[in-house]
Amino acid sequence: MVEVFDKYKDLIQEGDLALIWISRDNIKPVTINANETFNTRYGSFPHKDMIGKPYGSQIAIRTKVAKKFAFVHVMQPSPELWTLSLPHRTQIVYTPDSSYIMQRLNCSPNSRVIEAGTGSGSFSHAFARSVGQLYSYEFHPVRYEQATEEFKEHGLLDKNTIITHRDVCKDGFTIKKTDETSYQFKADEEQLQIKADVIFLDLPAPWEAIPHIDSVIDNDEKVGLCCFSPCIEQVDKTLEVLEKHGWFNVEMVEIQGRQYESRRQMVRSLDDALERLSDIKKRKLAMVERRQKAEEELEKKIEANEKNLPELPPKSIEKSKFNPFGKGYRVKEGDANFQWKEVTKVESEIKSHTSYLTFAYKIKRNEDENLDKN
């Protein structure tokens, strides 16, 4: 399988592709070089400090200006982390969608998968880790070259991935010797025999590619298809063509992912509420007494014709340190002086719609038998 993304190693070595975790939404791919430094707004992290450390280690530095500590984590690449850090060439398939698609299509080490188009290569890495053979197609020449170079660096082309520059909507999926492809043809081989049992279409017009699928699928297997479509209008056209070409068990699914965060909530008892009310009452009475005293002193000064009149005290109430509700005096979450309970909180920004997933299945052998009977 894939070396960089599939074989785990303990220690960081020079030349490794590592993912620097700055924050949950900020992960950067870096090739480790002892003479280089990884720069962030929090500080600079020399690569030599990372070499020899276990993957997952926290690399900390002390900033000169603020005299505070800054840190990052060095992670080993995986398809899931790569999805969060890769350079975007197109819209990508995120892990909530890709994991569901692979489970729904029963992908396994024996699966032979067709993926069109390659795009940014996010799903390609997940497929390459889990399936037996991956045939990936990209019609855009620049994206094809970028993906080919990336797959080569990550070890995908040496294992189970073949990428081809081809417009499958017009020219179909058959890989010929004249095509620009990573597959190495033999001298007497004119075209590559593909018997796929899983099809994934991430195309603007998947309905144009569906008629070409029959020539490259396994006649003896149940073939699963998934179309990744951002617009419902694309789904409508795809459904018409799927029905026309004999696909069955058609179903459309939309994945909505939410992230739940672990939090602690202060336990509020009746005694706390009564104590807080008592605390508020004491502070108000103290404020009234101070103002009355200040007013009396002011009247005496006026009567004595003093020129420099004292200022009235501020109207704000002096904050008390007791506050079980977190108002006024700041209470830090998890403070040992208070009682807490574990709760969950949904992330504030819910991820919006990505795409519709249209699933369908086909057994070509049954089609051929029906044609023979007719």
From Swiss-Prot:
Ranges in a coiled coil: none
Superkingdom, taxonomy of origin: Eukaryota
Keyword tRNA processing: yes
Major site of localization recorded for this protein: nucleus
Positions that bind S-adenosyl-L-methionine: S120, G121, S122, E138, R143, D167, V168, D202
Signal sequence, start to end: none
Keyword ATP-binding: no
GO biological process, one term: tRNA methylation
Molecular function terms from GO: tRNA (adenine(58)-N1)-methyltransferase activity
Enzyme class: transferase
Disulfide bridges in this chain: none
Cited Pfam families: GCD14
Cellular component annotations (GO), alphabetically ordered: nucleus; tRNA (m1A) methyltransferase complex
Subcellular location, record wording: Nucleus
Enzyme Commission numbers on file: 2.1.1.220
Reactions the enzyme catalyzes: adenosine(58) in tRNA + S-adenosyl-L-methionine = N(1)-methyladenosine(58) in tRNA + S-adenosyl-L-homocysteine + H(+)
Classification via InterPro entries: SAM-dependent_MTases_sf (IPR029063), TRM61_C (IPR049470), tRNA_MeTrfase_Gcd14 (IPR014816)
Keyword entries, A-Z: Methyltransferase, Nucleus, S-adenosyl-L-methionine, Transferase, tRNA processing
Family: Belongs to the class I-like SAM-binding methyltransferase superfamily. TRM61 family.
Subunit note: Heterotetramer; composed of two copies of TRM6 and two copies of TRM61.
Described function: Catalytic subunit of tRNA (adenine-N(1)-)-methyltransferase, which catalyzes the formation of N(1)-methyladenine at position 58 (m1A58) in initiator methionyl-tRNA.
Protein name: tRNA (adenine(58)-N(1))-methyltransferase catalytic subunit TRM61
Gene source species: Candida glabrata (strain ATCC 2001 / BCRC 20586 / JCM 3761 / NBRC 0622 / NRRL Y-65 / CBS 138) (Yeast)
